[in-house]
UniProtKB/Swiss-Prot annotation:
<dbReference type="GO" id="GO:0016747">
    <property type="term" value="F:acyltransferase activity, transferring groups other than amino-acyl groups"/>
</dbReference>
<keyword id="KW-0012">Acyltransferase</keyword>
<dbReference type="InterPro" id="IPR023213">
    <property type="entry name" value="CAT-like_dom_sf"/>
</dbReference>
<comment type="function">
    <text>O-acetyltransferase; part of the 2 gene clusters that mediate the biosynthesis of fusicoccins, diterpene glucosides that display phytohormone-like activity and function as potent activators of plasma membrane H(+)-ATPases in plants by modifying 14-3-3 proteins and cause the plant disease constriction canker.</text>
</comment>
<comment type="pathway">
    <text>Mycotoxin biosynthesis.</text>
</comment>
<dbReference type="Pfam" id="PF02458">
    <property type="entry name" value="Transferase"/>
</dbReference>
<feature type="active site" description="Proton acceptor">
    <location>
        <position position="165"/>
    </location>
</feature>
<dbReference type="InterPro" id="IPR050317">
    <property type="entry name" value="Plant_Fungal_Acyltransferase"/>
</dbReference>
<comment type="similarity">
    <text>Belongs to the plant acyltransferase family.</text>
</comment>
<protein>
    <recommendedName>
        <fullName>O-acetyltransferase PaAT-2</fullName>
        <ecNumber>2.3.1.-</ecNumber>
    </recommendedName>
</protein>
<keyword id="KW-0808">Transferase</keyword>
Length: 490
């Protein structure tokens, strides 16, 4: 497609952390399943209405590349049917979702834990034909940043939102979905103000508001991989991309399994605490996310658990959304749609992972994260990040293997999304029951296979019944052992 010129009201440069090399060719899709028949036109019109309000117009702008290679957004004076705020496509199928060859393969809740196929098989439901695959596809066309694809069955609806990662992280899209729901319900007055289009809270991060905060040294500075060791790490990582394949699957853990894992973790922590402090009965706190992370780390290490690999160092990397952690920079009741997720690190080894209890490992993860989330430590981490060329920090050793986690549980998508004004009629209720117009299931995928999606877990969160869904990318040899262990779970 050739680039189309439209009257432009404003041109806004991308922020450094949005225009990152690692984000440019990541085009994401979030697919939500509703067991209701939804009005596709109402979904489209309400989204376009939101993107015509105030600073929300920025999300309807077109991505362009400057002569120096940097990205910017061209915000039109107004949107028209020929140049809409969001790209819309609709597929209407005259059958029930379970009668469709691909629809019947969508994951559903069961009594026992289960491994499902990768969500990548559902590309047919995710986007229109010939979707954008790279940032260049946006720069060289009139495509809006946001794509809306609706698949209508006679008893259910799939709603997919696609966007370039340069526009936002998952929390930003959650904010979009919440405000979209408000417009759909005729509550435009409740739509949050989107942050100023030409500023970014992270610009003032290091000094703090007023520049009065004292700079601390980052707690993990001595563990940074730099110099020749950094070069070795990069070479090893490139080698794994070339020679170590990855296989993606979706992990389903029922609510009762999560309760059992959490009870196991808490009981082992109480036992450990009583050994150190006799008579102490208080349970150290660990969250569902801590326990799931610890369990997933153990699953990822199963195929490496031998005497030869026990000393293999691992760096557990958790994504941190800094919006709620920096209240002096992020204003309340203001929407921030962008990339504000950064890394927290936990150092360990395969041997330590396999020899410690689930509770101890979960507590280790939680303790290391708590040490890194104070505002002064976040600022110290950003100071180190600004010194790097590649826009990422490597913690551990030159031979450390990264294990990456992104936890979307706090987005609470099945709770905060409310498309009930678009419900034409309820469909047949499945294993998971939700209120009309609320999702019963969701997954994410990339429009193009990502080589960097490896040794990673995306905790998608809970469905309305409290069951957890987790997407994972691991070497093929890891999955038989994981399946075997999952069969032992309650």
């Amino acid at each position: 497609m050739s680039q189309t010129t439209v009257p432009v009201d404003r041109i806004v440069p991308f922020h450094r952390f949005d225009d990152a090399i690692g984000l440019r060719n990541s085009i994401l899709v979030w697919t939500l399943r509703f067991d209701d028949v939804l009005d596709a036109a109402k979904l489209r019109d309400s989204l376009n209405a939101l993107l015509s309000i105030g600073n929300w117009k920025r999300l309807g702008g077109r991505v362009r590349k400057k002569r120096d290679g940097k990205l910017e957004v061209h915000i039109p004076e107004s949107f028209t049917p020929q140049h809409p705020a969001a790209d819309f496509s609709h597929t209407k199928l005259d059958c029930c979702i379970d009668e469709h060859a691909l629809g019947r393969r969508l994951p559903v809740a069961t009594e026992k834990p289960k491994l499902y196929e990768s969500s990548t098989i559902f590309h047919e439901f995710a986007t229109r034909e010939n979707p954008p695959l790279t940032i260049e596809d946006y720069c060289n066309s009139d495509l809006p940043q946001i794509g809306l694809h609706v698949v209508s069955f006679t008893d259910a609806t799939l709603v997919s939102v696609s966007w370039p990662h340069t526009m936002s992280d998952a929390v930003g899209i959650q904010t979009l979905l919440i405000n979209w729901s408000r417009v759909m319900a005729g509550r435009e007055i409740e739509v949050q103000h989107l942050e100023d289009v030409e500023s970014n809270p992270l610009d003032n991060l290091e000094a703090g508001e007023g520049g009065t905060l004292k700079q601390e040294e980052w707690i993990l500075k001595s563990s940074l991989v730099t110099g020749v060791w950094f070069v070795i790490w990069v070479i090893r990582y490139i080698w794994t991309i070339i020679w170590v394949s990855q296989e993606s699957k979706l992990i389903y853990l029922p609510a009762r399994t999560i309760k059992a894992l959490r009870r196991e973790a808490e009981d082992s922590l109480v036992e450990q605490t009583q050994t150190l402090v006799p008579g102490h009965l208080e349970k150290p706190f660990v969250s569902d996310g801590d326990v799931i992370t610890a369990w997933a780390v153990r699953m990822a290490c199963l195929h490496q658990a031998s005497q030869q690999t026990s000393q293999q160092s691992i760096t557990i990397i958790n994504a941190l959304d800094v919006r709620a952690r920096l209240p002096d920079l992020f204003k309340q009741n203001t929407a921030y749609v962008g990339n504000f997720a950064f890394a927290l690190f936990t150092k360990t080894t395969v041997g330590q992972v396999m020899s410690t209890s689930l509770g101890e490992l979960a507590h280790t993860v939680r303790r290391s994260l708590l040490e890194q989330v104070p505002q002064a430590q976040i600022r110290a981490m950003f100071q180190e990040l600004r010194k790097t060329r590649m826009g990422a920090l490597i913690v551990g050793t030159a031979t450390s293997s990264p294990l990456i986690f992104s936890n979307w549980s706090k987005t609470k998508i099945c709770e905060v999304v409310d498309f009930s004004p678009a419900v034409i009629r309820p469909g047949k209720q499945g294993p998971v029951i939700s209120e009309p117009g609320k999702p019963v299931y969701h997954h994410s995928l990339h429009t193009k296979r990502s080589q960097t999606a490896r040794d990673a877990f995306n905790i998608l969160g809970k469905d309305p019944a409290g069951n957890y869904w987790i997407a994972a990318w691991l070497p093929p040899c890891a999955w038989p052992r994981i399946k075997e262990e999952m069969q032992k779970l309650p």
